[in-house]
C-alpha cells in the first residue's frame, strides 16, 4: 500500500510541472510582415518561463535569449538592407515556429482619427477622389504591405491584439488608409524598397485619446479611471487613454522609421486651448515608447470644414497650434491642406482629396529621411508684418522661387484698432511679399489669412504648397 501511494505521488508530480508550450508571438509578428531595414529590430513573445529561445533568421546566424520568470522574452536582431527577396525567421524553444514571406523595407505608422482611418474605398457618402486608378495601381506596387490594428479600447495597456499583414493588391487595397496608401505609393516610387504601413488609428478621437496615464495625470485634468472616463465622455470615441491602451500600445515594440499623423478635428470642440501642449506631449511620449528620441513625425493640418459655423475661428485656432508644434518640436513637419477642399465640401468633414495629402507627406519624408535634399517640401508661412499708413506688407518664408500667380488672391483680411476684420485686396509684389489694403481700414494694425473654420486659400509657393493660415494679433 505504501509503495502504491509513492507511485501515485510520483505521477502527480509530473502533472504539476509546467506543460511544454509552443512559443507564442504577438500577432503583428507574422507571415508577410515588413521589418524596418538596416535596424536593430526588436522581436518578442512568450515561452515557458526560464527556457531558452533560439532565433534563426534566414539572412544570418542564430541567436539565443532566455524567457524571464513570466515567460516574456525579447531580442534585437540586425535586419538586412531593403529588398524584394523573401525572408524567414524561425523561433524555437524546443518546438519551432517559422514566419515566411518577410520583407525588409521602410515601416511607417499611420496614426490619428477618421481622416487617417478613411480607407481607400471611402466612407459612406464620402468617396476618395481617384479611387479607381488607385485600385488599378495597387497590384503594381511591389512589396507594399499594411497591417490594420483593430480599434479597441482597454482600461490597461494591451501587449497584443489580433491582426495580420496584408499584401497590397487590388483585392486588399480597399481597406488600407487612403492617406497611408498614397503616402506609401509615392515613397515607394522614390526609394524602390518595400513599404510597410501600420494603421493604428480611430475616427473621432481627441489627442487625449492617445496620451498615456502618466501624461494625463501630470499635465491634464482628464480622468484615468474607466468608470469616470465613461461618465464624462458618453460618446466612446472621445474617451482619453483607452484608445491608446487598446489600439496603439500593442505596436510599441515594433521597429519603425516614422509616424504620419492626421488628427485635430475632435479637439476643435474639446480642450482646444491646450492642443499644442498636449500634441507635443504625445510626440514626446511616442518617441520615448519607440525608443527613438528623434523619430520623424509628419502631420496634417486639419482641413477646412464649417463645424456648424463656417465663419467661426475655432478650427483656425487649432491650425495655428499645429504650426506652433511644428515650429517648437524637432523633426516635426506640418502639411498644409487649405487648397485641398472643394467649395461644395464645407459640410464634409472627410474631404475627398487624399492623394495630395499622402504625397505631400511622402515628399517630406523623401526630403528629410531619404536623401532627396533638393525637394521643396515646406509650405510657405508668415514671417513678419510691416505697416505703412494704410498699407500692410506681409513677408513670407519658404516661398522658394516665388508665389504662383493667380488673378485674385483670396483669404487675406486686415483690421484696425477695433479688431474688426475686412477682406483685403492682396497684391503680390515680389518673391516673398504681399501688399494688403482695404477701403474699410484706414489705419491697419493686424492681418490674418485663412482664419475661419471654412476658408479656402489660393496662395501657393513654386512647389505648389499652400500658405499656412496665420494671424498677427
Predicted regions located by residue number:
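Cell-envelope and extracellular/periplasmic
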Residues: 22-473
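Bacterial Sec-dependent N-terminal signal peptides
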Residues: 1-24
Amino acid at each position: 500500500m505504501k509503495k502504491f501511494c509513492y507511485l501515485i505521488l510520483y505521477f502527480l508530480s509530473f502533472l504539476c510541472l509546467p506543460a511544454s508550450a509552443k512559443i507564442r508571438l504577438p500577432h503583428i509578428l507574422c507571415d508577410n510582415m515588413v521589418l524596418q531595414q538596416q535596424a536593430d529590430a526588436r522581436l518578442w513573445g512568450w515561452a515557458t518561463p526560464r527556457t531558452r529561445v533560439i532565433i534563426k533568421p534566414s539572412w544570418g546566424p542564430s541567436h539565443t535569449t532566455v524567457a524571464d520568470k513570466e515567460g516574456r522574452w525579447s531580442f534585437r536582431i540586425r535586419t538586412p538592407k531593403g529588398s524584394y527577396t523573401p525572408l524567414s525567421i524561425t523561433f524555437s524553444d524546443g518546438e519551432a515556429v517559422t514566419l515566411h514571406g518577410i520583407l525588409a523595407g521602410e515601416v511607417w505608422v499611420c496614426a490619428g482619427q477618421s481622416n487617417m482611418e478613411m480607407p481607400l474605398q471611402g466612407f459612406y457618402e464620402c468617396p476618395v477622389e481617384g479611387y479607381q486608378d488607385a485600385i488599378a495601381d495597387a497590384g503594381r506596387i511591389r512589396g507594399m504591405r499594411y497591417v490594420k490594428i483593430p480599434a479597441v479600447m482597454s482600461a490597461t495597456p494591451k501587449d497584443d491584439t489580433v491582426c495580420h499583414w496584408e499584401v497590397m493588391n487590388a483585392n486588399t487595397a480597399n481597406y488600407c488608409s487612403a492617406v497611408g496608401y498614397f503616402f506609401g505609393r509615392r515613397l515607394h516610387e522614390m526609394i524602390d524598397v518595400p513599404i510597410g504601413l501600420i494603421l493604428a488609428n480611430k475616427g473621432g478621437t481627441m489627442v487625449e485619446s492617445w496620451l498615456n496615464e502618466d501624461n494625463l495625470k501630470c499635465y491634464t485634468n482628464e480622468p484615468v479611471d474607466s468608470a469616470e472616463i465613461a461618465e464624462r465622455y458618453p460618446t466612446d470615441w472621445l474617451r482619453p487613454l483607452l484608445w491608446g491602451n487598446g489600439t496603439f500600445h500593442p505596436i510599441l515594440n515594433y521597429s519603425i522609421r516614422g509616424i504620419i499623423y492626421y488628427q485635430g478635428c475632435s479637439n476643435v470642440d474639446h480642450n482646444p486651448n491646450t492642443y499644442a501642449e498636449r500634441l507635443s506631449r504625445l510626440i514626446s511620449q511616442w518617441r520615448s515608447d519607440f525608443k527613438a528620441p528623434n523619430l520623424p513625425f509628419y502631420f496634417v493640418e486639419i482641413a477646412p470644414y464649417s463645424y456648424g459655423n463656417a465663419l467661426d475661428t475655432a478650427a483656425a485656432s487649432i491650425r495655428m497650434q499645429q504650426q506652433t508644434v511644428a515650429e517648437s518640436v524637432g523633426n516635426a513637419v506640418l502639411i498644409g491642406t487649405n487648397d485641398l477642399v472643394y467649395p461644395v465640401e464645407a459640410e464634409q468633414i472627410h474631404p475627398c482629396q487624399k492623394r495630395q495629402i499622402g504625397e505631400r507627406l511622402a515628399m517630406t519624408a523623401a526630403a528629410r529621411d531619404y536623401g532627396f535634399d533638393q525637394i521643396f517640401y515646406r509650405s510657405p508661412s508668415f514671417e513678419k508684418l510691416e505697416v505703412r499708413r494704410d498699407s500692410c506688407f506681409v513677408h513670407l518664408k519658404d516661398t522658394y522661387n516665388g508665389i504662383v500667380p493667380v488673378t485674385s488672391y483670396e483669404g487675406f483680411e486686415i483690421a484696425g484698432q477695433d479688431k474688426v476684420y475686412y477682406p483685403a485686396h492682396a497684391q503680390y509684389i515680389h518673391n516673398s511679399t504681399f501688399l494688403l489694403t482695404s477701403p474699410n481700414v484706414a489705419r491697419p494694425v493686424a492681418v490674418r489669412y485663412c482664419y475661419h473654420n471654412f476658408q479656402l486659400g489660393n496662395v501657393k509657393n513654386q512647389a505648389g504648397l499652400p500658405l499656412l493660415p496665420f494671424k498677427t494679433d
